[in-house]
């Protein structure tokens, strides 16, 4: 096949661009260095229990975009799962994001919504005066000004420090735009999502369906370097890290990584995910994937569970880069790489979470891919 485009990376971004271009007759080669499709959303079914295992941690599809929902539902059917995430703190489970129940449980009160609003506002005012915060200088001060010290210390501080691998005082206040606090009993994690659910056939099947075209060739276990000699003169959409593509010539862009420890057990988490807010527990989340399969009662009531603990990890070259560490220095370095890329590879378009150096949810990746494909086809 003579290709019109090479797409590097078969996650949702790459697969969406491939599907859209192929639908107009373009010939596409899409590659991925992993042995599977779907990127970090990759899932597979355990044959004994029927549990759909999310290889790289829980993925819950949610979006406010009708465009994205109408597109993705061409390739799968979703169940009606609505995500809730209790947070474990000092032996108790609290609803998260923070709501009226969280506040009452933590403070041992029985506030009404209006009473809680007044109380939290007073707590914030008192703590701002206590720490003499005029303008928050770091993440910790910003957190205190948003929700008060007690809520911040209980649910935000330690979780954040585990996630980022540093003191909250070393993190920029700019990272923390807002902390949602609901003065009602709504415990939905994605309360603003117009659409959400779990694909009934798993995430990998979505991407398989997207790439099921005579105009698309898929090669797994294949890196960009493996095919570079074959694709001279054609356009490339590259969804990997730009620093790796350019051999780290300007230095390594900062990322965070993850590691997972999983085991089959007869124990039961009781929830799809529980967050761990306390410092003495080094992992941030535990996953019990069977709780996503509300459309399969037999799986949901299985006596076995595949419990997976998620540990944040420092990133180094050779590890998987899961999400970028965005700050002024990293943004400046990324921009330098973009300039160098334009000089070396003017035929390459960057995209996807790693290529764009952005922390994107699945729906945002798909939306950006739809926009890119549309702009390409208009030329």
Where are these regions (language model features)?
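Short loop/edge segments at beta-strand edges and connector loops
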Residues: 9, 82, 218-222
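Mid-domain catalytic core of redox enzymes
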Residues: 222-340
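Dinucleotide-binding Rossmann-like beta1-alpha1 core, especially the glycine-rich loop
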Residues: 48-123
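C-terminal catalytic lobe of FAD-dependent flavoproteins
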Residues: 320-379
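Active-site/ligand-binding neighborhood in enzyme catalytic cores
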Residues: 90-234, 246
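Glycine-rich FAD pyrophosphate-binding loop
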Residues: 22-47
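N-terminal Rossmann-like FAD-binding beta1-loop-alpha1 element of flavoenzymes
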Residues: 3-30, 373
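Short, solvent-exposed loop/turn segments at secondary-structure junctions
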Residues: 12-14, 35-37, 49, 101, ...
